[in-house]
UniProtKB/Swiss-Prot annotation:
One of its GO terms (biological process) is peptidoglycan catabolic process. Its EC number is 3.2.1.-. It is an enzyme of class 3 (hydrolase). This is Lysozyme g-like protein 1. Disulfide bonds join 24-80, 38-49. Belongs to the glycosyl hydrolase 23 family. Residues 1-19 form the signal peptide. The active site is at residue 93. The lineage of its organism: Eukaryota, Metazoa, Chordata, Craniata, Vertebrata. GO terms for molecular function: lysozyme activity. Its main location: secreted. The keyword Metal-binding does not apply.
Length: 197
């Protein structure tokens, strides 16, 4: 066997193992999720909901997100966050990849509601912007981890996603880990994980 083929084989093996073990906040491959609610599916013109809807919406965003995958990988390494989860969050927050929605402080729980703003997709090109989103998510996960130290890493991830979306006081028990944002993001993240993220 030629050394070149051996080297290429080793690179392929290390690349696949790297992408399957990303992140300090749970294993998205093992998480079960119902996916997007029917409300989310209808919002985007789908006649179905659940994992199928989340996967379809992720599929629509995938070509755009692929262009920014190096940024997500870099930020993922910096914050020990699976790039597939970052892609899932960005996909959920950017309908069809056409624009990014900023709903102000709705998720912060501070009671301040700002005017809805739409940013062009070029905002995603910024490593700083992706870092800010990821830092906010990891801070939410760490806060949940501090409040509920006996929970599993998967529960911390779910709680962090719900807190990221609904504010830190939304999660009061493990009954609050089934929010629509979390379910949809995890289904999209699993799709992205299976498609190279």
């Amino acid at each position: 066997m030629s050394p070149l083929w051996l080297l290429l084989g080793l690179l392929a093996l290390t690349g696949s193992s790297e992408s399957s073990s990303w992140g300090c906040y749970g294993n998205i491959r093992t998480l079960d999720t119902p996916g997007a609610s029917c409300r989310i599916g209808r919002r985007y013109g789908l006649t179905y909901c659940g994992v199928r809807a989340s996967e379809r919406l992720a599929e629509v965003d995938r070509p755009y997100l692929l262009r920014h995958q190096p940024t997500m990988r870099l930020v993922g390494q910096k914050y020990c966050m699976d790039p597939a989860v970052i892609a899932g969050v960005l996909s959920r927050e950017s309908p069809g990849g056409n624009y990014v929605v900023d709903l102000g402080n709705i998720g912060s729980g501070l009671g301040m509601v700002k005017e809805t703003k739409f940013y062009p997709p070029t905002a995603w090109k910024s490593e700083t912007w992706v870092s800010q989103k990821t830092q906010t998510l990891t801070s939410s996960i760490k806060e949940i981890k501090t409040r509920f130290p006996t929970w599993t890493a998967d529960q911390h991830l779910r709680g962090g996603l719900c807190a990221y979306s609904k504010g830190p006081n939304f999660v009061r028990s493990n009954q609050d880990l089934n929010c629509d944002f979390c379910n949809d993001v995890l289904a999209r993240a699993k799709y992205f994980k299976d498609h190279g993220f």
